[in-house]
Amino acid sequence: RMNRVLRVLREKSQWDEPLGAGRGRGIAARIYSVSPIAQAVEVSVADNGDFTIDRVVCVLDCGFAVNPLGIEGQVEGGIAFGLGGAAFGNIDIVNGEVQQSNFHDYPVIRMPQMPKVEVHILPSDEPPTGVGEQATAPIAPAVANALFNATGRRVRRFPLSSQGFKLV
């Protein structure tokens, strides 16, 4: 099933099409609850480390899709949550107490930062599986791989803001 997901991702993301200077593409994949998912991310990076996420292509095989629109919403939400964590999610603990208390000191991704997201649900006769958390985990490594592809700089830890990259 993962092989099929990756083949469709290659096609839908136009993986073989070159990107211009300062642009990069990266992928990440995982199996969650027996269901494979893969994501391709395209970024544009300035010399100072400012970057935009231009496009996310997500392909998943979650078995029989009972509610495709609900699945798309879950996947888009998971991607948004994962992007915020990857870009600037940081929790400070002092004397056993979390210092962040709300969105004023724990930033989340904002609408202008959210990329175009394409969700491709593969037709399947397999039993349906969960998709609630499926899209969150692979997005950070896919972005890191895209940044590496664009800049040659490996990301070794998150958030990206701690590595000199700023999502704008």
Give the location of each predicted region.
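Cofactor-binding beta-sheet edge motifs in enzyme active sites
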Residues: 1-168
